[in-house]
Amino acid sequence: MSGRGKQGGKTRAKSKTRSSRAGLQFPVGRVHRLLRKGNYAERVGAGAPVYLAAVLEYLTAEILELAWERLPEITKRPVLSPGTCNSLCNDEELNKLLGGVTIAQGGVLPNIQSVLLPKKTESSKSTKSK
């Protein structure tokens, strides 16, 4: 035969997502769609959503790592928003970066202004020295 006709049909290669090609967990396709629909620029290049997804994944990993370190090793509790919020405020760089960000269900940070604290009197100082 001359090679015409049906030979073993070509199988289609399994599709790979852009996230798996980049080695990311965050969805590159969704980030690309949001960049296009958000009117941030007239055109969006192919590398921009990959880079943005990688940055978002890195920041998320850093935040979760800080919150995870805050948990005691003995307990098997989940990472909650108040713990995440406290961990962010204790970290200097992330606090500077995310200073104006509100975390849902994060609670409030314990902070008492020095003006509101009780004043130390002379009698309390003298009783402690005796």
UniProtKB/Swiss-Prot annotation:
Comp. bias regions, Basic residues? 7-19
Report the locations given in the UniProt record.
Nucleus; Chromosome
Protein modification: Monoubiquitination of Lys-120 (H2AK119Ub) gives a specific tag for epigenetic transcriptional repression. Following DNA double-strand breaks (DSBs), it is ubiquitinated through 'Lys-63' linkage of ubiquitin moieties, leading to the recruitment of repair proteins to sites of DNA damage. H2AK119Ub and ionizing radiation-induced 'Lys-63'-linked ubiquitination are distinct events.
Q: Which GO terms describe its molecular function?
A: DNA binding; protein heterodimerization activity; structural constituent of chromatin
The record's SUPFAM superfamilies line, in alphabetical order, gives: Histone-fold
PROSITE patterns registered for this protein in UniProt: HISTONE_H2A (PS00046)
> What Pfam families has UniProt attached to this entry?
Histone (PF00125), Histone_H2A_C (PF16211)
Q: Where is this region: Disordered?
A: 1-22
Residues involved in crosslink (Glycyl lysine isopeptide (Lys-Gly) (interchain with G-Cter in ubiquitin))? 14, 16, 120
Q: Which residues carry this modification: N5-methylglutamine?
A: 105
Q: Does the keyword Amino-acid biosynthesis apply?
A: no
Q: Which residues carry this modification: N6-acetyllysine?
A: 6
| N-acetylserine modification, residue list | 2
Any one GO cellular component localisation term in the record: nucleus
Q: Which UniProt keywords apply?
A: Acetylation, Chromosome, DNA-binding, Hydroxylation, Isopeptide bond, Methylation, Nucleosome core, Nucleus, Phosphoprotein, Ubl conjugation
**Per the similarity annotation, which family is this?**
Belongs to the histone H2A family.
- Function text: Core component of nucleosome. Nucleosomes wrap and compact DNA into chromatin, limiting DNA accessibility to the cellular machineries which require DNA as a template. Histones thereby play a central role in transcription regulation, DNA repair, DNA replication and chromosomal stability. DNA accessibility is regulated via a complex set of post-translational modifications of histones, also called histone code, and nucleosome remodeling.
State the name under which the record lists this protein.
Answer: Histone H2A type 2
Organism, by scientific name, is Xenopus laevis
